[in-house]
């Protein structure tokens, strides 16, 4: 008699058997015992609402196929983290303080996944749309107590010997004078006095050091196809162009994230060595900081396209672990403005967000501000790039105030972008609760050998430890000098290094 109809069988046991049966028939592909390669992807600033908005715009996302869990993001000194602390947690398996680049609360350097991979004879690479010296890539390839020490990070990255580095950040590699910002960040380790002008501090040419170290230097998309390892590809002075601005602009020399991902996988997998590859969709975070939903959906899609390339690669093999997880959410995005069914004053408060506006948007708020700085009338620039013609008096006043702002001040320039973003978002009917990060849990995605280990909830530093265990890379609880120390339940070292 079938157990499903037997009166003598406990119902709870039947349910367990049935659940086990479902697990068997729905199980994914079989993999080897341990992964040989690691592809780690970070969509910087992409929270749950960003995924929802992007999915409503583009349809089902590739990342939806491999969503397995969630992670909390608190650092050791704040519930709301920054990218340096979260990247360090993932890279080292140790929780740390905001602004820290691969150091613990005592400022001791921590061994990272990429460093451990290099010590074990693996190839390593990083692909980002930020400067390569920015917080996330830096936390895998350098050790400083403050993320703003970009020149020091740049020098350490070259000493590290990462086989492939693609992104922006030319201004931190070129020779140049020490600035007030550099002094404020105490980023003076690599500076030197000029022989004929001892009162002037100057940074050396790190491009020359890269050449001496054997790197092939490339700066354009055309050069990328012919490049070989080791390669340093720097395609922008600062950040790479946002996908939305690239779509409607003329920045043809910059590769997109999927192109760089495809190139990196081809080169790193083109021999018998295993590899660790870090990929970051860096400017999703920028879209959240500046309240730009159109920028956001295009950046999430660019990341998803790169993830598709990585997932296709992993699906063709049984030896590659793909893990993607957000470092933190940015902006506190809220979708829709549900108050009541009727209009409130002159403004239409609808329950639904307006995707038609995003489909008409031709420039990010950064792109629009650039046009305003070139002399464009703020309202005309806004209308031209969004298709929005009904602009309320308070919104028009805000936009027209932009030319009077001190746009040479970086903080004020960012405020100007938020002015444009706030007007845009009000018409799209989405909202933002902060110009900074939030503490909400973020998504974790995984495919390949050991992917089931990421199911459910974990603190972000535990994700780093699981990756290290699966890859057999000694990271968590290890300093750069290989000293071991214990990790407590909060992810912090529980005793000093000996």
Protein language model features and the residues they cover:
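A post-motif C-terminal structural segment
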Residues: 35-37, 46-51, 56-88, 93, ...
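Glycine-rich anion/phosphate-binding loops
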Residues: 102-111, 144, 148
């Amino acid at each position: 008699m079938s157990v499903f109809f037997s009166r003598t069988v406990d119902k709870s046991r039947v349910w367990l058997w049935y659940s086990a049966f479902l697990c068997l028939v729905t199980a994914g592909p079989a993999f080897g015992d341990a992964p040989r390669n690691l592809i780690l992807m970070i969509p910087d600033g992409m929270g749950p609402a960003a995924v929802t908005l992007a999915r409503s715009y583009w349809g089902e996302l590739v990342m939806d196929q491999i969503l397995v869990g969630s992670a909390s993001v608190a650092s050791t000194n704040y519930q709301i983290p920054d990218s340096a602390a979260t990247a360090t947690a993932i890279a080292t398996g140790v929780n740390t303080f905001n602004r820290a680049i691969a150091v613990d609360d005592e400022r001791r350097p921590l061994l990272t996944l990429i460093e451990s991979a290099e010590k074990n004879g693996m190839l390593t690479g990083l692909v980002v749309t930020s400067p390569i010296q920015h917080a996330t890539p830096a936390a895998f390839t350098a050790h400083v107590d403050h993320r703003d020490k970009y020149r020091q990070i740049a020098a350490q990255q070259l000493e590290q010997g990462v086989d492939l580095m693609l992104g922006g950040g030319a201004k931190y590699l070129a020779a140049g004078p020490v600035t007030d910002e550099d002094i404020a960040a105490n980023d003076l380790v690599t500076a030197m006095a000029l022989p004929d002008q001892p009162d002037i501090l100057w940074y050396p040419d790190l491009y020359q050091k890269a050449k001496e170290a054997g790197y092939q230097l490339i700066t354009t998309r055309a050069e990328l196809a012919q490049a070989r390892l080791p390669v340093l590809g720097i395609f922008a002075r600062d950040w790479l162009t946002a996908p939305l601005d690239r779509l409607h602009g003329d920045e043809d020399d910059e590769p997109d994230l999927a192109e760089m991902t495809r190139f990196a996988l081809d080169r790193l997998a083109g021999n018998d060595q295993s590899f660790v590859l870090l990929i970051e969709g860096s400017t999703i975070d920028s879209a959240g900081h500046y309240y730009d939903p159109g920028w956001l959906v295009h950046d999430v899609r660019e990341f998803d396209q790169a993830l598709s390339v990585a997932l296709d690669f992993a699906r063709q093999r049984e030896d590659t672990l793909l893990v993607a997880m957000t470092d933190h959410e940015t902006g506190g995005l809220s979708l829709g403005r549900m108050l009541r069914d009727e209009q409130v004053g002159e403004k239409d408060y609808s329950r639904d967000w307006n995707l038609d506006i995003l489909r008409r948007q031709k420039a990010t708020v950064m792109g629009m501000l650039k046009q305003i700085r070139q002399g464009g009338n703020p309202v005309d620039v806004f209308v031209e790039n969004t298709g929005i013609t009904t602009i309320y008096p308070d919104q028009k006043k805000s936009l027209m105030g932009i030319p009077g702002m001190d746009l040479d001040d970086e903080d004020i320039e960012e405020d100007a972008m938020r002015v444009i973003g706030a007007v845009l978002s009000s018409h799209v009917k989405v909202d933002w609760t902060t110009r900074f990060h939030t503490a909400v849990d973020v998504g974790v995605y995984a495919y390949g050998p050991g992917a089931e280990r990421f199911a459910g909830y974990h603190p972000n530093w535990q994700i780093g430890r699981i990756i290290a265990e699966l890859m057999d890379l000694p990271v968590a609880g290890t300093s750069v000098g290989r000293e071991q120390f214990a990790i407590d339940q909060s992810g912090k070292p529980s005793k000093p290094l000996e």
